[in-house]
C-alpha cells in the first residue's frame, strides 16, 4: 500500500497532474513562505495624555476611567459600542464626541497635529469652545489625546478605510470583512486612576517696602501661574496665564529699580503674589487670604490696602478690560488708577480699546469668575485686567493656548501701559502736572521685550497644570529665585485639601503609554478553525479511502495518456 501511495504522489507531481499536487501542497507552502508582518506594522507604541479628572467642591469633572483594552474604530463606523474611537482634531466636533459616548464607546482617542500653530483658526476656536463642555460632562469612558506621528496617522487611515468600506458593503461582504479584515487593538499600560493624597498647591510672594512710616498703603499685584485645559499634560497656558505672570515679573524688576534709590522710593508697599491653584477656584489665593487675615496679627493685607490688581490673559488683542465687582468711588486710589489707565491708553496707545466691565459676584456659582472676586469677598478693593471681555471665554482654559498665541509686541505694549498707569498713581504724576502722553519708562528703564519673551518661553516650555506642579519642581524653584533677585522676604505658601471635606481632589494616571497591536477579529479564529478542520477532514477521508483515490487517479492518468 505504501509503495502504491508513493507511486500516486510521484504521478501527482508530474506536469499532467500539477494542479492536483499544487492543491495538496499549497497550504503547507503558504505557511512556510508567508512573510511575517514588519514590527512597525504589527505594533506601535505612543504616549497618550488623559482628559482631566478632578473633584471640585465635591463635584466630579472629566473622565473617571483610565484603563483601555479594545479594538479601534473611527467615528464613521456603524457600531462603536465597546470600541476605541479614533478622531483627528481637524475632523473633530462635539456632536461626534457625544455620538461616541451615546453608543457606549469603550474609549475615545483624539489625535492632535504635531504643529499646533499651523492649525486653522476656526478649528482652534471651535475646540476652545468645546473643551469646557467636554469637562462638564462626567463620563466613565476613558478619553485620551495623542500627538500625531507617521505610524499613528497610518493606523488612523487604515482604520478609517476599514470603517468606510464596512459601511458601504452588502451584508455578505460585511460578514466576510468582519471575519477576515485586519484591525488594531488599543491597550494602555497603566492601571486604574486613584486619588492623589496630600497634594500641595504652592504660591510665592515677595514685597517691596515703601519709604516712610509703618502704616503705608499697600498695592497688591497678583497673577496665577498655573494653566488649564482638557488634558493636564497638554496645558501650557501661554496667554492664560503665562502672560499675566510675565507682566508681574517685569513689574517686580522695574519697581525694584525705582525702590533702590531714595529719590524714587515711593511711599507705597508693593506686594507681589504668584498664586497657585488659580484654575481651581483660586484655591491658593483663598487660603493665602485666610492665613493673612484670620490667622496672623501682622500682615500687609490687614491694614490700608489701596487696591489689588490681578493680571489674567493680557498677551494678545487690542482691547483691555478692567473687570470690577463694584465700580470704584471717586476720590479713591482705585478710581485714580482707572483714570490713569484710560489716560495712558488714550494718549500713548490709541490703538488700545480700554473699558471697565462691571459684574457682581455670584455666590450661587461654585466657581468664581475672576481672581479679584476672592479679594472682594474679603472686602478688599480689587479688579482684574484682561483683554477678554467675559470670564467664560474658552481661551482661558484650553490646550490650544500655546506660545504662538501670545504676540510679543502686544505683551510688551500692555506691560508698558500697566507700568505707566501704576507709576503715575504711585508717584501722583498727574497732580504734579506730568502730561499723560509723556512716557515714564524710557532709556535704561524701558520695558525689555527680550526679558518678557524669555520668561514666556520658559513658562510655556512645560505643562503647568496644578496637578503637575510639584512643590520641589524646577518651575517653583525658578520662580522663587527670579522674584528673590528683585524683591524682599520672598517665600512660598503651601496648601493641601482637607481630608474630611476636601475642596479639591486630583487623580493620577494622566500620562500613559498606549500600544496599538495589529490583530485579526475574534471570529477569524473560528473561521480559521473551520477551514483547518475541513482540510484535515478531507485529508483523513483520502487516507481512509486510499484505494478508491488510487483507482480514480489511475483512470485519470490512463485517460490523459490516450489523449
Curated annotation (Swiss-Prot):
GO biological process assignments: multi-pass transmembrane protein insertion into ER membrane; regulation of signal transduction
Keywords: Endoplasmic reticulum, Glycoprotein, Membrane, Signal, Transmembrane, Transmembrane helix
Signal peptide interval: 1-42
One Pfam family recorded for the sequence: Peptidase_M28
InterPro entries: Nicalin (IPR016574), Peptidase_M28 (IPR007484)
GO cellular component, one term: multi-pass translocon complex
CDD domains assigned to the protein according to its UniProt record, in alphabetical order: M28_nicalin_like (cd03882)
Domain of life of the native organism: Eukaryota
Location in or out of the cell: Endoplasmic reticulum membrane
Spans within the Lumenal topological domain: 43-522
Glycosylation sites: 241, 428
Gene3D superfamilies, alphabetized: Zn peptidases
Cytoplasmic side: 544-563
Topology in membrane: Single-pass type I membrane protein
Residues spanning the membrane: 523-543
Self-association and partners: Component of the back of Sec61 (BOS) complex, composed of NCLN/Nicalin, NOMO1 and TMEM147. The BOS complex is part of the multi-pass translocon (MPT) complex, composed of three subcomplexes, the GEL complex (composed of RAB5IF/OPTI and TMCO1), the BOS complex (composed of NCLN/Nicalin, NOMO1 and TMEM147) and the PAT complex (composed of WDR83OS/Asterix and CCDC47). The MPT complex associates with the SEC61 complex.
Functional note: Component of the multi-pass translocon (MPT) complex that mediates insertion of multi-pass membrane proteins into the lipid bilayer of membranes. The MPT complex takes over after the SEC61 complex: following membrane insertion of the first few transmembrane segments of proteins by the SEC61 complex, the MPT complex occludes the lateral gate of the SEC61 complex to promote insertion of subsequent transmembrane regions. May antagonize Nodal signaling and subsequent organization of axial structures during mesodermal patterning, via its interaction with NOMO.
Name of the protein in its database record: BOS complex subunit NCLN
Gene giving rise to this polypeptide: NCLN
Amino acid at each position: 500500500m505504501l509503495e502504491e501511495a508513493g507511486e500516486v504522489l510521484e504521478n501527482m507531481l508530474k506536469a499532467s497532474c500539477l494542479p492536483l499536487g499544487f492543491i495538496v501542497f499549497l497550504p503547507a507552502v503558504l505557511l512556510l513562505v508567508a512573510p511575517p508582518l514588519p514590527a512597525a506594522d504589527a505594533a506601535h507604541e505612543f504616549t497618550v495624555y488623559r482628559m482631566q479628572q478632578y473633584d471640585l467642591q465635591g463635584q466630579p469633572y472629566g473622565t473617571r476611567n483610565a484603563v483601555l483594552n479594545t479594538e479601534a474604530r473611527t467615528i464613521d463606523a456603524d457600531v462603536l459600542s465597546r470600541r476605541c474611537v479614533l478622531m483627528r482634531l481637524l475632523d473633530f466636533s462635539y456632536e461626534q464626541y457625544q455620538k461616541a459616548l451615546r453608543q457606549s464607546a469603550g474609549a475615545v482617542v483624539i489625535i492632535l497635529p504635531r504643529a499646533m500653530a499651523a492649525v486653522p483658526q476656526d478649528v482652534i476656536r471651535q475646540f476652545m469652545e468645546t473643551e469646557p463642555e467636554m469637562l462638564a460632562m462626567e463620563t466613565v469612558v476613558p478619553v485620551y489625546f495623542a500627538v500625531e506621528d507617521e505610524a499613528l496617522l497610518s493606523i488612523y487611515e487604515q482604520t478609517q478605510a476599514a470603517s468606510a468600506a464596512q459601511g458601504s458593503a452588502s451584508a455578505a461582504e460585511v460578514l466576510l470583512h468582519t471575519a477576515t479584515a485586519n484591525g488594531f487593538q488599543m491597550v494602555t499600560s497603566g492601571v486604574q486612576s486613584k486619588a492623589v493624597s496630600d497634594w500641595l498647591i504652592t504660591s510665592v510672594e515677595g514685597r517691596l517696602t515703601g519709604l516712610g512710616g509703618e502704616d503705608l498703603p499697600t498695592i497688591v499685584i497678583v497673577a496665577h501661574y498655573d494653566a488649564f485645559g482638557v488634558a493636564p499634560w497638554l496645558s501650557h497656558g501661554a496667554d492664560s496665564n503665562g502672560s499675566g505672570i510675565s507682566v508681574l515679573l517685569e513689574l517686580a524688576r522695574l519697581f525694584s529699580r525705582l525702590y533702590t534709590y531714595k529719590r524714587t522710593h515711593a511711599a507705597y508697599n508693593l506686594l507681589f503674589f504668584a498664586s497657585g491653584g488659580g484654575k481651581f477656584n483660586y484655591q491658593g489665593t483663598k487660603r493665602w487670604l485666610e492665613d493673612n487675615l484670620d490667622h496672623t496679627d501682622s500682615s500687609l493685607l490687614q491694614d490700608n490696602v489701596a487696591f489689588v490688581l490681578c493680571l489674567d490673559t493680557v498677551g494678545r488683542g487690542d482691547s483691555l478690560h478692567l473687570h470690577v465687582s463694584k465700580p470704584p468711588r471717586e476720590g479713591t486710589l482705585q478710581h485714580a488708577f482707572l483714570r490713569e489707565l484710560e489716560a495712558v491708553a488714550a494718549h500713548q496707545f490709541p490703538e488700545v480699546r480700554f473699558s471697565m466691565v462691571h459684574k457682581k459676584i455670584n455666590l450661587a456659582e461654585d466657581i468664581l469668575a475672576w481672581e479679584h472676586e476672592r479679594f472682594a469677598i474679603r472686602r478688599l478693593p480689587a479688579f482684574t485686567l484682561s483683554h477678554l471681555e467675559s470670564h467664560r471665554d474658552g481661551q482661558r482654559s484650553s490646550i490650544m493656548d500655546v506660545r504662538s498665541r501670545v504676540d510679543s509686541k502686544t505683551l510688551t505694549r500692555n506691560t508698558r501701559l500697566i507700568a505707566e498707569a501704576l507709576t503715575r498713581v504711585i508717584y501722583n504724576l498727574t497732580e504734579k502736572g506730568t502730561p499723560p502722553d509723556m512716557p515714564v519708562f524710557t532709556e535704561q528703564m524701558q520695558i525689555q521685550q527680550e526679558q518678557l519673551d524669555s520668561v514666556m518661553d520658559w513658562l510655556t516650555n512645560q505643562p503647568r497644570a496644578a496637578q503637575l506642579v510639584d512643590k520641589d519642581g524646577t518651575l517653583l524653584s525658578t520662580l522663587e529665585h527670579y522674584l528673590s533677585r528683585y524683591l524682599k522676604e520672598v517665600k512660598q505658601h503651601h496648601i493641601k485639601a482637607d481630608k474630611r471635606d476636601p475642596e479639591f481632589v486630583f487623580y493620577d494616571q494622566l500620562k500613559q503609554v498606549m500600544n496599538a497591536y495589529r490583530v485579526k477579529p475574534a471570529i477569524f479564529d473560528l473561521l480559521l478553525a473551520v477551514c483547518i478542520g475541513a482540510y484535515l477532514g478531507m485529508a483523513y477521508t483520502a487516507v481512509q479511502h486510499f484505494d478508491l483515490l488510487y483507482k480514480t487517479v489511475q483512470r485519470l492518468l490512463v485517460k490523459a495518456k490516450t489523449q
